[in-house]
Amino acid sequence: MAPLPALVALLPGIPLTPPPALETAPLPSQRQPPGRPAALSRGQGDWLEINGWRQRARWRIEQGELWLPLEVLDGQLGVSRSPAGADGLELEWFGVRVLVPSAQQRSLDDEVPVPTTALLRARGVTISHRQGPLPLELPPAELLSIRSRDQGLGLRRVVLDLAAPALVRSGDGRLQLAIRSSPEQQRQLQTLGLEPSDTNGWLSLRVGDARRLSLASPWRLVLDLPLGETPNAAEPPRPQGDPRLQALQAQGLQLQRQILSSGGQQLLVNSVQLDPRQVPLELRTLNRPSGMQGLSSLNQLARQEQALIAINGGYFNRVNRLPLGAMREQGRWLSGPILNRGAIGWSAGELPQFDRLSLEESVEDSQQQRWPIASVNSGYVQKGLARYTADWGPRYQAITGTEMGVVVRGGSVQQRYELGELNDGVPLAAGDLLIVARGGANVPWQPGDRLSLRSRSSSPLGLKPHVMGGGPLLLQNGRVVLNGAAEGFTPGFLQQGAPRTVVGSDGRQLWLITLQGVNGPGPTLWETAQLLRQQGLVDALNLDGGSSTGLVVSNVQTVMGRGVAAAVHNGLGLVPRQPGP
């Protein structure tokens, strides 16, 4: 995730010319017709053509406004985004800023699209609506100069000075930039270890997990590269040639890729199968070590845990980047279950258990009065009390505009926060319990009051040291148990076809599965459940899907749900088991 401009400006090293005040592009309702290009005609589709590069991506035009998913803006155009107020967003691209309140966010199948016409046209992007893929065109910018310097703080900054704004695509550790560069400039980039290559007007650079920032006056693209992650290091072994995989396959690991039919369409099904009691791989949750807010690439999540194989995990809010479901690690709830949705729970070296899961929690005062807790370390907000711990991150900042709370340490209330005092954030130390009240609920306690926490899981799997939530639950004990309404999913979600990620079991082996449509959108949940039962599975849990669907094998993302390596919140990984003493 790109750093906020204010933070970047504080980093030492190459000075950044202080940018002028950001331009603010008007929202659709604020636009004035004089001088504007002709309104776009109504339509929708599944493909974009970005400076000639064809990319599968959902789009919609309504009332002259182009709506694009957040993943497309970030991964295919280079737009930065950050939270703004309660459920709002701020989009920023080469000095233009667009504020998008929650009312301006919509649903496009399983994507979150936002209005983009003003932002794109403010920087010269031509939008042409015609039959077939929707073209987005921005003339390639000239690369004027390259500057580089070690920053301290474990970063090296590379600044690309440009003659104009440029499109920026990202994925699998590389950036593709719509810029024109000279052979001498490419040699300079090679010296910096960025492995430049120029193809059809796109300059490709290997940047690893670099943070990026676009600026105006003058036009610049800033890359902060983590030191120690050398972009030009030897390429990771390809899956088919990785000796680690070959050794594990000899011990029973299976990797399959096949075309199957379901619901009248062909599906590309990738599966990983193993007996965790025999194959020396451990199933682990994958998450960001910095806390529960934020997204990462699946490849990055896998690498930091040294997972040889990984799939994307549970649901999250793409706007505020917070978790929406259960995730438990080493007996700690990093994020609690919601809506009695499906989950798996497991211990090392065993097959997971599958069930629907909820937590029943309450706090009790010295007079034995109890107050129910609605959620634990969750981005799913509702009226009532919620609790947060240091597993949420080093700080908690109010998610809604009306919150108050108390910090409990050692069973005693230490500090009270009135309405509004959580907006700027409060620290969370190890052992702290922050109880937050929302939606008019009250926290009646004062410093010194004694409180105790009571917690009970609705299913034995909630007592397992490791839990991953998703939903809906598809199969249990050999039966199709799909009941999306009981798990809080909408009818539209249940009926749509989409790429899928599933974790399952045939009673002997663990299965990690992705399903994609060959020439269609993908299977419905019912089609997924039926197909997996036909393949011999007895238990199966649907995880986050759509553009989130991904499979990483040996540091290579071999499956991308809609053709883009989308950022995700968490995942499931298979990590080589360490040999005993």
Predicted regions: what is each one?
Residues 10-56, 61, 65, 75-103, ...:
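Gly/Ser/Thr/Pro-rich low-complexity, intrinsically disordered segments
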Residues 1-11:
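Sec-dependent N-terminal signal peptides
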